Regions:
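Glycine-rich flexible loops
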Residues: 1-147
Length: 147
């Protein structure tokens, strides 16, 4: 598989940082939790923020390049423990080039109720039937591919 050009890689990293800032600005941040990732089409590696930084704090030079096993390929900062959310989605779906995981206040509160969520907007009806999806298999960190 052909490696992306330096210009493509630079643009992807810049867009990831900007997307993270927008997520933070829109209330998606939760201290240092929450992360987004991006990869060039057809690649087995992706860019993600390191642990210890909020969505609003990251800069291009902070980003890590990880492989689908969750190993850091490029970068020196510690990898986020939930890297497997991104690697497993990208492994299962080669067509997916970006993954976002956040802890927005209102969706988190509603998801914690443990009841089906009713679609109250036209956009939400895309998910019905059967229900607006939510992950409820664990409340722990996703710290391995098996989780």
């Amino acid at each position: 598989m052909k490696k992306p050009s330096a210009a493509t890689e630079k643009a992807l990293k810049r867009r990831l940082v900007e997307a993270s800032w927008i997520l933070a600005m829109e209330g998606q941040g939760d201290l240092v939790w929450g992360h987004a990732s991006v990869r060039a089409p057809g690649q087995d590696t992706f860019w993600i923020k390191p642990t210890g930084l909020g969505l609003d704090e990251i800069r291009v030079e902070d980003l890590l390049l990880c492989d689908l096993e969750g190993r850091v390929v490029r970068g020196t900062k510690p990898r986020h423990i939930e890297v497997y959310i991104h690697s497993e989605v990208m492994r299962a779906r080669p067509d997916v080039c970006a993954v976002v995981h956040t802890h927005a206040l209102h969706p988190t509160v509603f998801a914690s109720l443990g009841v089906p969520l009713a679609p109250v907007t036209h956009e939400a009806t895309v998910f019905v039937p059967p229900d607006i999806p939510r992950f409820d298999e664990t409340t722990d960190l996703i710290n391995s591919p098996e989780r």
